[in-house]
């Protein structure tokens, strides 16, 4: 019997080392002044930024879900990392936190250095958009756990907020206005249903034109999740904001109640915005009920802010100056906590 090696068992340490060699300079470009030391050690060191009286660390972890299946089918891996970062930084942003640093986890059947590099380029691009440093990560090669050519991603983000300025929804009051920021598409939620409709019901291929949009299926489904950090931080630093929500799995109806106190109800005017064509196509082709659409997809609204009525115009102007499409969706009323969709 020949002597066995780790490579013969399916784990290529040399490929892992080559991946690290490629991604370290990419990550280095994202570093903030608060990062102490370099990349590649056993742990990362990040000091809390100056200027805070009582800084609080705010953390979140998330993945990309089955949007990865579209990346596998198209062999396009350069933007999926943006989605990974977006899911985390938009979550800590909800509480008024500035994203500080990010770590990624890539698990795969076989390490392909070029593919790992493409993924991390996307992660770094997302970190640059979100203003946080990519300080480290883990790439795990597990041939007996993942199918050939497939991988999974997870991300972990830490942000910082002034304790006295944490946004937690407790100040939400009747008469407050609900503002919505346009999404870039499906973002990173609802893909199990979307893929079933697009590939099984409609029978489309990834290079086929997507109905109504003029884009390919691949371009439509791989459009990166929008990162709202910079314009939203500008708004919360200048104006009163009572609550915010990142519209992920559960949609508007599932996520907005998470930041509303008892006795507060959001009344959303469905006619306030035009639902993008991608969602209309999915609903019509899949014969999906309206309520199911709104609790599965973002329906064109990726982020929500609840603000005092007197501040609504000023907040809208600040967000618009930052490049956001802002929609006045409705208002807060007294009532059972939840969301009411009106025609």
Region roles according to the model:
Residues 52-53, 64-67, 162-165, 186-188, ...:
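Short, acidic Gly/Pro/Ser/Thr-rich loop/turn segments
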Residues 12, 62, 175, 246, ...:
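Residue-level signature of catalytic and energy-coupling elements of molecular machines
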Residues 106-107, 185, 310, 333:
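Short, glycine/serine-rich, charged loops/turns that create anion-binding
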Residues 152, 165-217, 253:
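Short, acidic (Asp/Glu-rich) active-site segment that either coordinates a divalent metal cofactor
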Residues 2-8, 19, 115-133, 146-153, ...:
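Glycine-/charge-enriched secondary-structure boundary and capping motifs
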Residues 1-33:
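N-terminal amphipathic/basic leader segments beginning at the initiator methionine
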Residues 53-59, 63-65, 169, 204-207, ...:
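Acidic-glycine-rich active-site phosphate/pyrophosphate-binding loop
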Residues 25-184:
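Glycine-rich phosphate/pyrophosphate-binding loop regions near the starts of catalytic domains
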